[in-house]
Amino acid sequence: MKKPVFLLIILLIILSLLIFPNAFAKQGHMKLLAVKETESGYEGGIADLFLEIKPGSGRVFLETFPLTRTDTQMSTRFAKAIACDAIERDCDDVDFFYTITADSAIIAGPSAGASIAVLTVAMLEDIELEQSYAITGTINSGGLIGPVGGLKAKVEAAKKAGLKKVFIPSGELIVKADNSTTDLKNLSKGLGIEVAEASTLSEAVKGFTGREIRQKFKSIEISQEYTNTMKSLAKDLCDRSNKLKAEAKNLDYTVNYAANASSRGLWNDSDKISALRDNAQNLTIKGREAFERQAFYSSASYCFGANVEFSTLLLLAKNLSKEEALKETKKLTGEIADFRSEMEAFDKKTITDLEAYIAANERLTEAKESLAQALELLNKTNKTDRMARTLAYASERLNSANSWATFLGKSGKAFNLNKDVLKKSCQNKISEADERKQYVELYIPNTLDSIKHTIGKAGAELEKGNYELCLSTASKAKADVDMILSVFGVDAAQYQNIAERKLAIVKNNIARQADKGIFPILGYSYYEYANSLKESDVLSALLYSEYALELGNLDIYFKEADKPKRQIITERIDKKLFRELFGAFITGVLAGIFAAYFINKKYFTNKKINKKNAKLRKKK
C-alpha cells in the first residue's frame, strides 16, 4: 500500500473516533427548585439540573455539587425509568449522566423527580424546554406527580431567580405550614410569577413544550381472561360464604360456648356472638351486591371477610381442646408448605404470572403468620377460644391463596423474570421506598415507624431470597408513604377530590397498560376496590389507589423475553441524532480528504525536490 493512502486511512479513523462520540452525545438543562436548611428554617433555593445522554447500556450516573441533604440517586433512576416508560422507549442503549449544581447544600431527593423526568423526556424526544419554567414534585408510578414540601419557599425562590412559571403538583395550591395557610395563586399574583398545577408527567411536558406525549384513554379494555377468572374466584369465595353460613345457622352457641364463657374470662355474653354473625351477614350481602355490579375483586374481598367471621363462629362452637387446636394448626401448616412448594416449581413467564404468584404467596405468608399468632395465644393462655379467629383467618387465607393461583399460566407477553432480575427489582424498590420515607421524615419526623417496619420486612424477604414478596412489600411501603404525602397539609374536605383525581390517573394508567398487552391484575383489582371504598372510607380508597399505581407498573423493572435486538442506526437513534452522525461522518471524510491532499502534495513535492537534487548530484 502506498504511504499516502495508508496515511489517509489512519487519519480518517482518528477523525471518526474523535468526532463520532460528540455526535452521539446530547445535552440538556433546566432549573431545579429546592429548599435549603438554614438557622431560621427552610428557605427556597435554585439549582441547575444538567443531563447528558451518550450511547451505552442503560446506566444512570448522578453527581451533585455540593452533596444534597437527602439521597437523590434512587429518585433519579426511578424518574428515568418512568420517563422511558412514558414514551415507550427502551433506554438500554444509552447512558444517562445527571448533574445537580447549587451554591449551597440543598434538599433534593424525591422532590426532584418530576424535574428529572421532564428533562429526560425532552432529551429523548428532542424537544426544546422553556428555560424560564420550573417544576417541583415527586414522580410516581404511572407518571403521577406527587406532593412535596416547601412550596411557598420554592415559588419565592423561583421569582427571585427570574423564572416566569412554576408547575406544582395538582391539589397543592393551598399550603398549610407553621400554623398558617398560604394560597399560592394569591402569592404568585403578588410576586408576579405564574403558578400552574400538573397531575402527570404528560401534563408537565405539555406545559413546558406544548407537546402531548401520551394518549388519553377513555375506558379500560378489561381483559376477558381476567374477568372470567376473577368472576370464578369471587363466585367460589361467595359460594363458600353461603355454605359456611348454612353450617353456622343451626349451631347453639349458648349451650356449646357462651354458657361457659364467664369461667374463661372472654365472650361473657351472647351479644359478641351476635356481632360476629351480623358482621358476617353484612359482608355476605356486600359481596353479593358487588358481584351483581360485576365488581368481582370487591365481591371476593367482602366474601373473604364473611368467611373469616363464619369460620370463627364454627370454631367457637366446636369448643376445641388444646390437642385438637394443635392438630388443626399442624394440618394447616403442612398444607401451606405443600402449596408453597407447588408455587415455587411454577415457571413464571408473564407479568400476570408474577402478580398471581405475589398475590397467592402474600396470602400464604399471612396464613403462616396467623398460625404463629394462634400458637402463641394458645401457649400463653392455654385457651382455645382466644385463638379461634386467628386460626379461622389462616384457614381462609390459605383458601384464597388457592383461588388466586388460578391466574397462573394465563396468556400474555413473556418477560425475563429470572432470580437475578427479580432480586434487582426488589433492591431498587426498597431503595425507592426508603428514600421516599427519609424525605417525608424531614417534614413530619418520628411518624413513619410502621412504614419503617414494612421496609424491614421487605429487606427480610430479600435476605431469604423471596424476591417477589420483597418487591410487593416494598411497593406497598412506598405506596404508604405516598398516601401520607398526598394528604399532608391538606384539608380533610379535599380528600374526596384527591381520591377522584388519583383514581382517574390510575384508570388511565391501567388502560395504557392494557393497550400494551399487559393487563395488571393486581393494579386493576386495587383500583376497583378503591372505587368501591371512596364514598364510605376515603382514606382507604386513597391507599388502595396508591397500591394500584405501584403494582400496576411492575413491567418497568423487567424486559420482554426474546425481544430482538434493535439496530442502533435504524431504531435506537432518533432522526436528528442520525443526521448529526451522518454530518459528522461527512465532515470527517472531507477533513480527511483535505488533509490527505496536503499530505500528498507535500509528499510529491518533496519527492520531486529529492529527484532534482539527485540529478544535480549525479551531474557533478
Mark where each language-model region is:
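Alpha-helical transmembrane segments
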Residues: G588-T605
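Charged, amphipathic alpha-helical scaffolding segments
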Residues: R288-A317, L378-G409, G459-S486, D537-Y557
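Peripheral, non-AAA+ core regions of ATP-driven protein-machinery
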Residues: F24-Q281, I285, A317, L326, ...
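Juxtamembrane/start-of-transmembrane alpha-helix segments at the extracytoplasmic/lumenal side
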Residues: T570-T587
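Membrane-proximal extracellular "stem/stalk" segments
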Residues: G465-I573
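Bacterial N-terminal signal peptides
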Residues: I9-L18
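Cytoplasmic C-terminal tails of single-pass
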Residues: F604-K620
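Long, low-complexity or tandemly repetitive, helically biased scaffold regions used
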Residues: T312-L315, N319, E323-N399, S403-K424, ...
